[in-house]
């Protein structure tokens, strides 16, 4: 679809995901063993045959650039590209000051692409969405701007932009992260919230960005400034994400904000459920990513016992000897010695776990070496002296750590 340009906001610092974001940006954080968070946004575009995409980066972007270069390089195909663009301070010596400013500072690239519509999406949520369906809705309504939205429990809605709509789907109210969110009429326990995904008519977007950039009182953010200014005109519409249908998927849509350690851990546990609400296996909606050239995972018994793999994902290049792995995700090249007991844990890859270790509800970042006999997640009071422990008791081992030596 040559008239459509994708702009993916991938500059998030991800401070609430520390220590996983100490050395990488939030969109580059691994997920589900084989993927990075950025992959899910990119797949939503590519599987909808929308292949003119700029990815806007900012903080600690080297890991993200490396991943995209290896896994998402489609340059050379006429009128198709997926190009990362680092923050370049084109409008002055300053970083992006808000989501709208990030797009404004790259106005030149958009104008050169001559789009009719511009799709502006985030890159740090887990979901599948056929963007063409939202685009069709946008065109049908002859909207200047379309915002995708979903129902959210009222208790959680204050973290998002809260929307009011009329019977035709037109936005008639919007408040960014309100302390007292308004509920959906007739549905008092839920609010309608913005997913942070927008489709603009290109000429409207360009004009709004230029006007906003000249406004010294603006925070240069779509949720705080652009949307509240636009919706009273009557040409801003709201796309109901629950109506998005993907062949081979359940009717009930799945969307998770993984902006905290606890949410990130829970989204992984969702993958491991018998009837997982988010599937990695739909052939009609393949999840593309970079797959390193590694041998299959290997499982062997040992003198200390038989290997047991229960309700888990184990990636290529991994080696598990005579250990029990339950409800866990093991990333590439996870090396597990014998007599280990690992449950409800996430190993991001290139992790070595020595003989007789016990891991309970632990996230282990890359390049970690855990000494034989180490127990983590068993005594949280002791763990807190050394590691980050989340509100829900998830222990996080930082990248490159040597534990128990």
Swiss-Prot record:
Q: So what EC number does this one have?
A: 2.7.7.27
Q: Which SUPFAM superfamilies match?
A: Nucleotide-diphospho-sugar transferases, Trimeric LpxA-like enzymes
The reaction(s) catalysed by this protein are: alpha-D-glucose 1-phosphate + ATP + H(+) = ADP-alpha-D-glucose + diphosphate
Q: What positions does the entry give for alpha-D-glucose 1-phosphate binding?
A: 96, 161, 176-177, 194
> Which GO molecular function entries does the Swiss-Prot or TrEMBL record give?
ATP binding; glucose-1-phosphate adenylyltransferase activity
- GO BP annotations listed: glycogen biosynthetic process
Spell out the Gene3D superfamilies in the cross-references.
Hexapeptide repeat proteins (2.160.10.10), Spore Coat Polysaccharide Biosynthesis Protein SpsA, Chain A (3.90.550.10)
Q: How does it assemble?
A: Homotetramer.
Which protein are we looking at?
Glucose-1-phosphate adenylyltransferase 1
């Amino acid at each position: 679809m040559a008239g459509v340009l994708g702009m993916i906001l991938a500059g998030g610092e991800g401070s609430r995901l520390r220590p996983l974001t100490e050395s990488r940006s939030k969109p580059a954080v691994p997920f589900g063993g084989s993927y990075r968070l950025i992959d899910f946004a990119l797949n939503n575009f590519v599987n909808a045959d929308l292949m003119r995409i700029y990815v806007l980066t900012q903080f600690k972007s080297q890991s993200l650039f490396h991943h995209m270069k290896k896994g998402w390089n489609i340059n050379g195909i006429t009128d198709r590209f997926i190009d990362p663009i680092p923050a370049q301070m084109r409008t002055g010596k300053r970083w992006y000051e808000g989501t709208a400013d990030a797009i404004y500072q790259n106005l030149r690239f958009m104008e050169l692409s001559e789009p009719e519509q511009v799709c502006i999406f985030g890159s740090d949520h887990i979901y599948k969405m056929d963007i063409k369906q939202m685009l069709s809705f946008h065109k049908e309504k002859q909207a200047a701007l379309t915002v995708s939205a979903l129902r959210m429990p009222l208790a959680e809605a204050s973290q998002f932009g809260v929307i009011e709509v009329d019977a035709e789907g037109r936005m008639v109210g919007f408040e960014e992260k309100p302390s007292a969110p308004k509920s959906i009429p007739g549905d008092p326990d839920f609010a309608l919230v913005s997913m942070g995904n927008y489709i603009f008519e290109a000429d409207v977007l360009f004009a709004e960005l230029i006007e906003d950039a000249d406004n010294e009182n603006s925070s240069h953010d779509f949720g705080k400034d652009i949307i509240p200014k636009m919706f009273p005109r009557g040409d801003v519409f709201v796309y109901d994400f629950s109506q998005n249908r993907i062949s081979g998927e359940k009717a009930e849509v799945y969307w998770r904000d993984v902006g905290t350690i606890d949410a990130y851990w829970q989204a992984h546990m969702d993958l491991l459920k018998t009837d997982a609400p988010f599937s990695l296996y739909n052939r009609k909606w393949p999840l593309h990513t970079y797959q390193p050239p590694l041998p299959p995972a290997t499982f062997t018994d040992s003198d200390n016992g038989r290997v047991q793999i229960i309700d888990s994902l184990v990636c290529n290049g991994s080696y598990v000897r005579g250990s029990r792995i339950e409800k866990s995700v093991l990333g590439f090249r996870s090396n597990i010695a014998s007599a280990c007991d690992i449950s409800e844990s996430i190993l991001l890859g290139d992790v070595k776990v020595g003989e007789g270790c016990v891991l309970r509800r632990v996230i282990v970042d890359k390049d970690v070496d855990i000494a034989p006999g180490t127990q983590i997640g068993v005594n949280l009071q002791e763990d807190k002296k050394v590691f980050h422990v989340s509100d829900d008791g998830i222990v996080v081992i930082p990248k490159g750590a040597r534990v128990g030596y």
